[in-house]
Curated annotation (Swiss-Prot):
Subunit structure as annotated in this protein's UniProt entry: Homodimer.
Region (Disordered): 36-61
One GO CC term on file: apoplast
UniProt keyword Signal, yes or no: yes
Protein name, entry field: Dirigent protein 24
Gene that this polypeptide is encoded by: DIR24
Compartment(s) of residence: Secreted, Extracellular space, Apoplast
Similarity comment text for this entry: Belongs to the plant dirigent protein family.
Amino acid sequence: MAKALSLTIFLFLLIASNVQSARLLDEVQTQPQLVPQVPEEEDDSPQAVTTTPTPIPLPGPATGGPEPILEFFMHDVLGGSHPSARVVTGIVAQTEVNGIPFSKSSNNIFPVDNAVPLVNANSINNLINPNTAPLLTGLSGSQANTVIQNSNGNSQGSLSSNNLPFVTTGQLPPIAALQQLMFGSITVVDDELTEGHELGSAIIGRAQGFYLASSLDGTSQTLSLTVLLHEDHDHHDTLDDAISFFGVHRTASHASHIAVVGGTGRFEHAKGYAVVETLHNQEDQHVTDGHDTILHFSVYLTYYKA
């Protein structure tokens, strides 16, 4: 009896455990699906950055930029006993001079047909004298009374010395304006350069070149100059520190801008520009019997050999 009861209880418990196991097996818990994470690809292509260029103002007095790298004063002396400027082409008053070289043949000089005579010491007084030399006004753009000379046709003492003669206004054609006579005249210069404009200022070099009257109204001079800065050494024995300029100097304006086109020495391959100002009412600053025009150069360089 006891064994039958024990067997019954054992079977009951066995069946109950099987039922519980089957129920647990049927209840499958839903597992979350694992999705592999793919790393984001980095964009290696460079990003285009748009920047607006900022304009760089040119240095100079108008923009309040840096100070000029160099300043000097050029003295252009016309006439007198020691001129630094001489005319080489231009209009003269007498038509005989306009005919040089002559179109007529002369057997007195060349014993051949159609020869062209040369000017000699005997004929020079009849051709060129202080009253037939070209008219100049210089870099100041205005004619000075001290420049015009008249020695009544006498060339002695003028052509043989450093005096530079000029025509008088009475010899000019009545219908020709002064500006029209100036137009096209070329003047070569070998002017002194000083540190300041005042009397006795130290000489730092020379300006050599020429200027051309390039406007019909007489207010423009085309400059082509090379400034030689020898300062404390002999510029004939050493390489000069030189700057070359080219541009138009407008005598009617307060200041003009001309280009720096090159240089030598420490200014080799120089680039930039110069502001040129004409100093007025400076006639009594220097001892000279000619007309001294003073130009103030302020040089601004964007590149030069230090």
